[in-house]
């Protein structure tokens, strides 16, 4: 059995073998990544857990804190399929509220500062998806965003720990643990890959960086802080 973390790793392993079971975690979308035709009924040697966060809850959080938001920036590496999917899903989540999503793409960490500066004066907030390039440079992004006191919301708790303002996040521990349980079932002969549908996190949790809240001077509703 092979374990794979992230979409690029899963794709590399899936291309290397069609026979050995592969259990993946932290995959945005197994179908769009061409790992299988149906997450509900895996038809390849791949299964696992996805890391799709609750974008509807993320947008609800942003609107609770910034009810007058009109333009939301998103920065991502366009070569990461998981990031492209998240950008499209964010647009869908924002559309009912008339929030325009402003996209900026980067190729490497060297592009982060310039990309962040393009948001200054143009967006009311920034959303960071589970993107490997951007996630590795959150402090650089924050240094620019804080110049204009632009709140940065992260797709996962790690972004907040790196300096972002807030996140309605899934637990990567939980989806990793569940992938481990799937792997154990396969190794023990209890199930085959095709018996195990792709799963996601059962619940999300709110994370707020209170130091960043003070830096931004944001009046966060008590109802949010009490959650």
Spell out what each predicted region is.
Residues 1-227:
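Short hydrophobic alpha-helices and adjacent helix-cap/hinge residues
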């Amino acid at each position: 059995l092979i374990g794979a973390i992230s979409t690029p790793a899963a794709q590399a392993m899936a291309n290397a073998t069609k026979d050995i079971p592969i259990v993946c975690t932290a995959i945005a979308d197994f179908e769009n990544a061409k790992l299988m035709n149906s997450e509900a009924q895996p038809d390849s040697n791949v299964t696992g857990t996805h890391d799709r966060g609750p974008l509807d809850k993320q947008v609800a959080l942003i609107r609770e804190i910034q009810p007058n938001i009109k333009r939301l920036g998103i920065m991502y590496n366009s070569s990461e399929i998981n990031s492209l999917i998240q950008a499209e899903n964010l647009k869908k989540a924002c559309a009912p509220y008339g929030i325009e999503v402003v996209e900026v793409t980067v190729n490497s960490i060297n592009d982060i500062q310039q990309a962040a500066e393009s948001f200054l004066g143009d967006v009311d907030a920034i959303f960071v998806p589970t993107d490997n390039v951007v996630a590795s440079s959150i402090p650089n992004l924050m240094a620019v965003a804080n110049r204009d006191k632009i709140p940065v919301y992260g797709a996962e708790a790690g972004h907040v720990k790196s300096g972002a303002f807030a996140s309605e996040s899934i637990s990567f521990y939980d989806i990793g643990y569940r992938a481990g349980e799937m792997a154990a079932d396969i190794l023990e002969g209890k199930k085959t890959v095709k018996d195990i549908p792709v799963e996601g996190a059962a619940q999300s949790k709110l994370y707020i960086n209170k130091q960043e809240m003070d830096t931004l001077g944001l009046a966060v509703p008590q109802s949010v802080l009490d959650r």
